[in-house]
Curated annotation (Swiss-Prot):
Key word Manganese present: no
Naturally occurring in which organism (per UniProt): Arabidopsis thaliana (Mouse-ear cress)
Record carries keyword Transmembrane helix: yes
Protein name: Sulfite exporter TauE/SafE family protein 5
Chain segments annotated as transmembrane: 1-21, 57-77, 78-98, 101-121, 127-147, 150-170, 224-244, 259-279, 315-335, 353-373, 378-398, 409-429
Main localization (coarse): membrane
Length: 449
């Protein structure tokens, strides 16, 4: 996998260095094709530059975002990796605008998942794990949103393409794994060979469907731990208060602060000790719980973790929040495979990931608003569309998988769309970078204010 990424980056570098030299050698037909594609992309961007108005491109983007939310809702990954290519390629907006829209759409879809997890009668959410992940994830989101304003669009395009390629590879591998498990369970059930025990087969079936259906087979009613949920809200609110004090891009907030002044950066830097304090408290609480009940911890709502894994989680959540803030994706597609590789059960991973995506996506959306995001009315409409699609998707996918017994179909669907998005985003991103370069536009880093 690392080799593929290195080759991918080398190809991008070769393209950037030799593009000017190869331009003269291109056949006339290639010039005409590139010119027509460039004209089409320019016309889309010009129509979306000032204000997004109702058009065929916007309607098509809304339909595709509805389908994307429909597919990704049951997996608990947020869907940001699908929303951004749709907005950039179909609606014609730039990558930064698409990232801000994606934050709103991911928020809308995650609300549907949170409602399903909290009030669906399932004991799957690991609130202790969420308490351990949330502070550093919100810190990463804050830094990521600033990076979105500072980094040039060509660099964001490269980072997003690499990230999406990695996520696509992990998703397809998971799909193959699920397909093999489904086939094995089907063969054993069909031939009536319970050599490994019916209980073990049922357990594998439950684990197989849990990441997508969030373990609909779990029938135990769960009480919502309001204390832990309240602590999570307090953590979110603590970061939110800092954003309110900071104000918008003009420095207008509860208190008047000069944008990018000394007070501005001191206020933002308070998020670092805040995240460290909350993370330390969560680590101490998790360690004390596991020391008090080392034998029956797995039977409780929490997940038993070794010390090295517990220390690794804050760094993982920070990276997920950072990329989520830059791309507006919520971070679910990054943190979900990392949690699975760390030994977290799939059903707990899916439920907890969708819960964390809600917190990170809402924080990204709030920051984009405070930083002067445009076309907010359209973003609200897209968010509501994704909310409805996610609710419908949770119901339809559960029925479809229950009927056909192939939960891996959804994994392959998401992986296929993500792979296609990687190719399209890389192609059109390279074309946009080349267009800006030829036009002599500034392609360097920008000030955060």
């Amino acid at each position: 996998m690392k080799t593929l990424f290195v080759l991918f980056l080398l190809l991008l570098c070769v393209f950037a260095i030799n593009a000017n030299q190869e331009e003269e050698n291109l056949p006339q037909s290639h010039h005409n094709l590139l010119h027509k594609v460039q004209q089409w992309r320019t016309s889309l961007k010009e129509s979306s530059a000032a204000e997004l108005k109702l058009s065929s491109a916007i309607i098509m983007a809304g339909v595709l975002c509805f389908l994307a939310a429909l597919i990704s809702s049951a997996g608990g990954i947020g869907g940001g990796g699908l929303f951004i290519p749709i907005m950039t390629i179909v609606a014609g907006v730039d990558l930064k605008t698409a990232s801000s829209f994606s934050a709103f759409m991911v928020t809308g879809g995650s609300i549907a998942n949170v409602i399903s997890n909290l009030f669906g009668g399932k004991a799957l959410l690991d609130y202790d794990l969420a308490l351990l992940l949330e502070p550093c994830m919100l810190l990463g989101v804050s830094i990521g949103v600033i990076c979105n304003r500072v980094l040039p669009e060509w660099l964001i395009t490269v980072l997003f393409a690499v990230f999406l390629a990695w996520s696509s590879l992990k998703t397809c591998r998971s799909g193959v794994k699920f397909w093999k498990l489904e086939s094995e369970i089907a063969r054993e059930s069909g031939h009536g060979r319970p050599e490994r025990g019916q209980g073990q087969i049922e357990e594998e079936t439950k684990n197989l469907k849990a990441p997508l259906l969030e373990a609909q087979a779990t029938k135990n009613k769960s009480k919502i731990p309001w204390t832990k949920l309240g602590v999570l809200v307090i953590v979110w609110a603590s970061f939110f208060v800092i954003y309110l004090l900071r104000g918008n891009k003009d420095g207008k907030g509860i208190i008047t602060i000069k944008p990018c002044g000394v007070e501005y950066w001191i206020l933002l830097s308070l998020q670092i000790p805040l995240a460290l304090i909350f993370t330390k408290l969560a680590l101490s609480r998790t360690e004390s719980r596991q020391e008090q009940s080392p034998n029956d911890q797995k039977n409780q709502e929490g997940t038993r973790l070794d010390k090295s894994t517990r220390l690794k989680f804050p760094a993982m959540s920070f990276l997920a929040g950072l990329l989520g803030g830059i791309f507006g994706i919520g971070g679910g597609m990054l943190i979900s495979p990392l949690l699975l590789q760390s030994g977290i059960p799939p059903q707990i991973t899916a439920a907890t990931t969708s819960f964390m995506v809600f917190f990170s996506a809402t924080m990204s959306a709030v920051q984009y608003l405070l930083l002067g995001m445009q076309n907010t009315d359209t973003a609200y409409v897209f968010s509501f569309i994704c909310f409805l699609a996610s609710l419908l998707g949770l119901v339809l996918v559960q029925k479809a998988v229950a009927q056909f017994g192939r939960a891996s179909i959804i994994v392959f669907s998401v992986g296929t769309v993500m792979s296609l998005s990687t190719v399209l985003m890389t192609s059109f991103g390279a074309l946009d970078v080349w267009t800006d370069y030829v036009a002599g536009k500034d392609m360097g880093f920008k000030l955060p204010c």
